[in-house]
Amino acid sequence: MKKLNIIFAGTPDFAATHLQALLNSEHNVIAVYTQPDKPAGRGKKLQASPVKQLAEVHHIPVYQPKSLRKEEAQAELQALNADVMVVVAYGLILPEAVLKAPKYGCLNVHGSLLPRWRGAAPIQRSIWAGDTETGVTIMQMDIGLDTGDMLHKVTTPILATETSASLYAKLAELAPPALLEVLNGLTSGQFKPEKQQDEQANYAEKLTKEEAKLDWNMTACQLERNIRAFNPAPMAYLTLMVNEVEERIKVYQAEVLPHQEKTVGTVLAVDKNGIQIATQQGVLNITQLQPAGKKPMSVQDFLNGRGDWFKVGSVL
């Protein structure tokens, strides 16, 4: 195994997990690229990314260009003379000059089994679509969006209770060892590049707040998947009128019950076991929810003091 000089590019916690794995390895992280500090919290103070915070602890030079399209930024990166650049949830587009700068190019850790889900939200979309398995792909980056040759894949099942939060955590454990395997075998050609089958690709669009609103014209199965896919953000929700005020309630957990021939959105039953609502196909039984300004709670706790919010026979 050849010890590699690595540039690491990433921003959130998921990326920091990979940076830590590289720091624990035999390889040498010579520089870190991350997004510029951004205002956060109530005071809107500038907040360094998790990757920057970790890099500074280990006294690694940090670069935070707003863009890598400018020649000065590209020249600065090329001057580092890296063997390879590892990119994990960085958030900036890499021009061709950057992709070609390191000796072995740029490797990306992608949170799906390519080419199934390309794009910004592969973890969430795999749950949303009802996939039964997912994983991580280590790929050689090219100028396309997640279109590069695949070097290594590791799979994991998607459980029936999986949320985006739990799957994110699972992939954060799975991915760093897979990345290290590829890096350790990079110079020996152990991992053969495999072309993606473009016709099998789907684009994993970011989840929107509009999409997060539960639509009773969907099936109960799809709504239940949405609830899990949209957790922890932007969180699935429903609205209902309470004393002429629209209440917005986040939904954390639900289950699918057999279909009843009722108008979609009809409240069928309300008790400690759940709030049952008719959908286009099947009944959605909501078991955990969160009223505005409160913590997530069971239906039983929700109904204490709010027993008249959901009226049996009413249509949401």
UniProtKB/Swiss-Prot annotation:
MF terms in GO:
methionyl-tRNA formyltransferase activity
Q: Which family does it belong to?
A: Belongs to the Fmt family.
Residues that bind (6S)-5,6,7,8-tetrahydrofolate? S112, L113, L114, P115
Q: What class of enzyme is it?
A: transferase
Q: Which SUPFAM superfamilies match?
A: FMT C-terminal domain-like, Formyltransferase
InterPro entries per record: Fmt (IPR005794), Formyl_trans_C (IPR005793), Formyl_trans_C_sf (IPR037022), Formyl_transf_N (IPR002376), Formyl_transf_N_sf (IPR036477), Formyl_transferase-like_C_sf (IPR011034), GART_AS (IPR001555), Met-tRNA-FMT_C (IPR044135)
> Can you name the source organism?
Glaesserella parasuis serovar 5 (strain SH0165)
Q: Tell me which stretches of the chain form a coiled coil.
A: none
Its recorded reaction(s) are: L-methionyl-tRNA(fMet) + (6R)-10-formyltetrahydrofolate = N-formyl-L-methionyl-tRNA(fMet) + (6S)-5,6,7,8-tetrahydrofolate + H(+)
What biological function has been recorded for the protein in this entry? Attaches a formyl group to the free amino group of methionyl-tRNA(fMet). The formyl group appears to play a dual role in the initiator identity of N-formylmethionyl-tRNA by promoting its recognition by IF2 and preventing the misappropriation of this tRNA by the elongation apparatus.
The protein's matches in Pfam families, at most eight in alphabetical order, are given as:
Formyl_trans_C, Formyl_trans_N
Instruction: Indicate what this protein is called per its UniProt record.
Output: Methionyl-tRNA formyltransferase
E.C. code = 2.1.2.9
Offer a single GO CC term for the protein: cytosol
Q: Which domain of life is it from?
A: Bacteria
The alphabetized UniProt keywords are: Protein biosynthesis, Transferase
